[in-house]
Amino acid sequence: MHPLGIIVNPMSGRDVRRVAARASISAHHDKQQQVTRLVLGALQNGAQEVYLAREPFRISERAVENIAEKTQIKMLEFKLKHNAHDTVTAAKRMWAAGCRTFIVLGGDGTNRIVARTCPDAVLLPISTGTNNVFPQMVEASVAGAAAGLICSGQVPIEENCYRCKQVHVECDDGTTDLALVDAILLKNDQLGSLLPFSASNISQIFLARSEAASVGIS
């Protein structure tokens, strides 16, 4: 039996693709309602403790303010940097607290950060981003219940959870990284370009999975 960690990326589903690709917005209120259902589903199906982390928009804090089981909910506080490092810190703190199962609300990038930080964690990825391949659209109550069953040991990890493929990257300077979906080598790229538009700039593609129904490059 181990605690459940829930990590929310407040900025997922809110980038420039709302303009460039007419993508839908993942509102903070929607995420808040999802977190409420996740926590209730987990606690009612065996989880004894749920760890959350404060973020700038107080999504997690507001999600649990009216939940009766306050003693079973732990809210982590740390100095925010308002970038991806906050996800790293939350994952490390939750892992240190004993969390071995994580529900991640975000996109491919958020899940990549958690997988890189805690490579032996069980991830239940819920899509709140855009053009996601790794996380899935799933009802939060069902996801919470599944996580509760895993955390409580009622559903054994070894028999019901599988390890996903990864692409491991090593750069010339010795730094390493990993991808859960794809690693793309771009030519004529510019520093700070987070949304490459031209397919002619794609030099090489390394895929962990190839699915006809999945959209875009991660």
Q: Which residues are covered by each model-predicted region?
A:
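ATP/NTP phosphate-donor binding region
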Residues: M1-T101, R116, P156
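Short beta-strand segments
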Residues: G5-V8, A53, V104-G106, P125-S127, ...
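Catalytic, metal-anchored helix/loop core of enzyme active sites in primary metabolism
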Residues: R22, S26, P125, A143-A145
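Short, well-ordered, mixed-charge alpha-helical segments that flank or form enzyme active sites
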Residues: S60, T110-I113, N131-P135, D177, ...
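Short, hinge-like loop/turn segments at secondary-structure boundaries
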Residues: A68-K70, A121, A140-G144
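Short, acidic/small-residue loops that bind anionic groups at enzyme active sites
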Residues: V104-L105, V114-A140, I150
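Short, glycine-/small-residue-rich phosphate/pyrophosphate-handling segment
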Residues: N132-V169
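ATP/pyrophosphate-binding catalytic subdomain of soluble kinases
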Residues: P156-S218
